[in-house]
Amino acid sequence: MLGPMDEFPVHQIPQPIAWPGSSDRNFYDRSYFNAHDRTGDIFLISGIGYYPNLGVKDAFVLVRRGDEQTAVHLSDAVDQDRLNQNVLNYRVEVTDPLHSLRIVMDETEGMAVDLTWNGLFDVVQEQRHILRAGTRVTLDAQRFAQLGSWSGHIAIDGKEIAVDPAVWIGSRDRSWGIRPIGEAEPAGRPADPPFEGMWWLYVPMAFDDFSIVLIIQEDPSGFRSLNDCTRIWKDGRVEQLGWPRVKIHYTSGTRIPTGATIEATAQSGALLRFEVESKLPVPIHVGGGYGGDSDWIHGMWKGDKFTERLTYDMTDPAIIGRAGFGVIDHVGRALCTEGSKPSVEGWGLFEHGALGRHDPSGFTDWLTVAD
């Protein structure tokens, strides 16, 4: 079970790098990327994950253009070489750790990608994220995030899309630890009290002089179990932004947001107000493999050298019905006003999900929608 990493002094416990320190089946190690051109016409989301206790590695590319959302999935048996991240035709080349990398997917199911990332700001280490169901830890993860630009090209069914770093922007994160993956486990005794829902907001955005990474999670009563809100300056300074107040603006009759108003506090005491708008929504549980996806689940064994392509009509009532029951990633635009200073424009990701009951939003159960 030895691999190339075992040549280096990077071990944390007395066993090969390929053996996770935890025997939990849900141990994972994953990268997530998104890219868009600030128009709302296209949004690409991609990721690669290793699940050593399940013997699986997989990757995906998800693209929305207009009313069509297309997913390419790749899955294979895990290997021991963590220095060369790859799943079949998909690979991630880390050219300058924490600063630049390259994603390549050679033609697979009619799609190909060659994108180079350059960080616009330093990475920021997020707070450790822990969730429990009863006495069991169901999520225990560490993550870092970064805002950056993209260059290269995307090809779909023979049509090439040029990716100009002057306009293409996005965010990425690396996370590892424990989270639900693969096939569902037997539930055992029903939870008491039962799981009633979760409210989630994640907003990484890049402005000219700074980036922000806002992460907020609340339980059904509105109690905030995660509040990790920072501003990253060009010189590397990281500034905490206090306890933001958030108002999500939902489309009437749905839980799909059109935007949000976020008020935070700079270290100077000045009010920071972000007016965020959605330019294009991508439900990441529709082909992306995230919670509630009925078509693709991260870490599930699909057999050796598995690939597939799925295409969704986002106007299909069945897909619309699915979209409201998961987390949605949006091409995000924001105007930031700090005190009496002129507003500045930023772009990035606006990710939100309101699942189940959330008293502050007026959602009394799993089916309540916005007025």
Show where each model-derived region lies.
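Structured soluble/peripheral alpha/beta segments that form catalytic or ligand/cofactor-binding pockets
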Residues: 1-371
